[in-house]
């Protein structure tokens, strides 16, 4: 979400002096090399974002069963928002990074609105997915009754509506800027006023990240409790049959520890990637409007630094398909689309591992039967399938 930046000479360094011989050739060559390297890196990022999210959308279009699960609708809508980032936001900025100047004139305001809308929609969908997981794991039976397709569509609609409201309306009415009109067509500067910087950052990042931290913390606690209950039942079984209880108990404790570690690693990856990509940008986004600068003074944050953090945030859109759409159903669809089903085949146990089930929770027949049988064996519902 690039809501404070300028595209004049951001990543490629200062323009070389025109003309000249000898000593001016080396800076010019270095500048061109840096621009070429920047262009290659950004092209790779854009293409990977396009391919990853397009693959998710293609899988949903091709396979009807992926459209039948409400939780997959959130992953699909997330992929669409990230696809919009790759199409409506990244390419225009990449061209400007390489050229060192904004080349698209009056399109600047529309582009800024697209940037805010798409980035906010992506982050809000990550928040919705975390809430969906928490509800599914904490109250699975109530979740099955209440998480209907209609309710899922309402949640998706709220995310997109909120994203549009905080982007296009303020930008088109110029409520977001610091009170000066853009006069240079080669400068797409969207420096924010303090009110809009704080309010938009709260809606787009800080409130969603607090919700995600809360839901994933609760998920870890629920998972740890269920793992320990299962482990205690497994240790009790050999005692009932008078088997080698000591060895089985030690093995069960090791298994329980491995499961808890896997839960923690999975949740750490989900939250760690998101925070690593977006936190630096939003910290600067709230800090920069409070800088008091003289007209001729240097900015308190360099354009290059801000540009790097902006691209880190957008890079999250290339990682989301890997984190959120690699459950067993999607992986099978991907292997079929890519024509590698013979080589990508995995066993049933490997295909439905914990990290994938947690990354995109869904009930299938096998898991429901397993949950029912284990739940009946201890007189209660099995709430956390591994």
UniProtKB/Swiss-Prot annotation:
Establish whether keyword Transmembrane is in the entry: yes
Skewed-composition ranges (Polar residues): 1-10
GO molecular function: any one? G protein-coupled receptor activity
Q: List the disulfide bonds.
A: 108-188
Q: Which stretches are transmembrane?
A: 36-56, 73-92, 110-131, 151-175, 196-220, 267-292, 306-325
Q: Which residues carry attached sugars according to the database record?
A: 189, 193
Q: What SMART domains does its record include?
A: 7TM_GPCR_Srsx
Q: Where in the cell is it found?
A: Cell membrane; Cell projection, Cilium membrane
Q: Which top-rank group of organisms is this from?
A: Eukaryota
Which keywords annotate this record?
Answer: Cell membrane, Cell projection, Disulfide bond, G-protein coupled receptor, Glycoprotein, Membrane, Receptor, Transducer, Transmembrane, Transmembrane helix
Q: How does it sit in the membrane?
A: Multi-pass membrane protein
Give the GO cellular component terms, alphabetically. ciliary membrane
User: What role does this protein play?
Assistant: This is one of the five types (D1 to D5) of receptors for dopamine. The activity of this receptor is mediated by G proteins which activate adenylyl cyclase.
The protein depicted here goes by the name D(1)-like dopamine receptor
Q: Which source organism? A: Oreochromis mossambicus
The organism's lineage is: Eukaryota, Metazoa, Chordata, Craniata, Vertebrata
């Amino acid at each position: 979400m690039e809501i404070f930046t300028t595209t004049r000479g951001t990543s490629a360094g200062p323009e070389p002096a025109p003309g000249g011989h000898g000593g001016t050739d080396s800076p010019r060559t270095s500048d061109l090399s840096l621009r070429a390297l920047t262009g290659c890196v950004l092209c790779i990022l854009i293409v990977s974002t396009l391919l990853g999210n397009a693959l998710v959308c293609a899988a949903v279009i091709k396979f009807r069963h992926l459209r039948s699960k409400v939780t997959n609708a959130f992953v699909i809508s997330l992929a669409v928002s990230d696809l919009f980032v790759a199409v409506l936001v990244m390419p225009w900025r990449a061209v400007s990074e390489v050229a060192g100047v904004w080349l698209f004139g009056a399109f600047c305001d529309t582009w800024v609105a697209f940037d805010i809308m798409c980035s906010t929609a992506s982050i809000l969908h990550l928040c919705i997915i975390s809430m969906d997981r928490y509800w599914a794991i904490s109250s699975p039976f109530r979740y099955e009754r209440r998480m209907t397709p209609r309710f899922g569509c309402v949640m998706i609609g709220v995310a997109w509506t909120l994203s549009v409201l905080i982007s296009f309306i303020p930008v088109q009415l110029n409520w977001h800027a610091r009170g000066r009109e853009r006069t240079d067509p080669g400068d797409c500067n969207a420096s924010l006023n303090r009110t809009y910087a704080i309010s938009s950052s709260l809606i787009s990042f800080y409130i969603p990240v607090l919700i995600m931290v809360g839901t994933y913390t609760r998920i870890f606690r629920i998972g740890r409790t269920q793992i320990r209950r299962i482990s205690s039942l497994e240790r009790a079984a050999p005692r009932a049959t008078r088997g080698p209880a000591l060895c089985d108990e030690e093995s069960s404790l090791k298994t329980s520890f491995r499961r808890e570690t896997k839960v923690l690693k999975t949740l750490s990856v989900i939250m760690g990637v998101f925070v690593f990509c977006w936190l630096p940008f939003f910290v600067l986004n709230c800090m920069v409007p409070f800088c008091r600068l003289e007209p001729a003074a240097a900015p308190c944050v360099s354009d290059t630094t801000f540009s790097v953090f902006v691209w880190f945030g957008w890079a999250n859109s290339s990682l989301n398909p890997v984190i959120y759409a690699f459950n067993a159903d999607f992986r099978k669809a991907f292997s079929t689309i890519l024509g590698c089903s013979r080589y990508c085949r995995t066993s049933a146990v490997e295909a439905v591992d914990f990290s994938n089930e947690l990354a995109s929770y869904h009930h299938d027949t096998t898991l429901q039967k397993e949950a029912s049988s284990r739940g009946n064996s201890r007189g209660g519902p099995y709430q956390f399938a591994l």
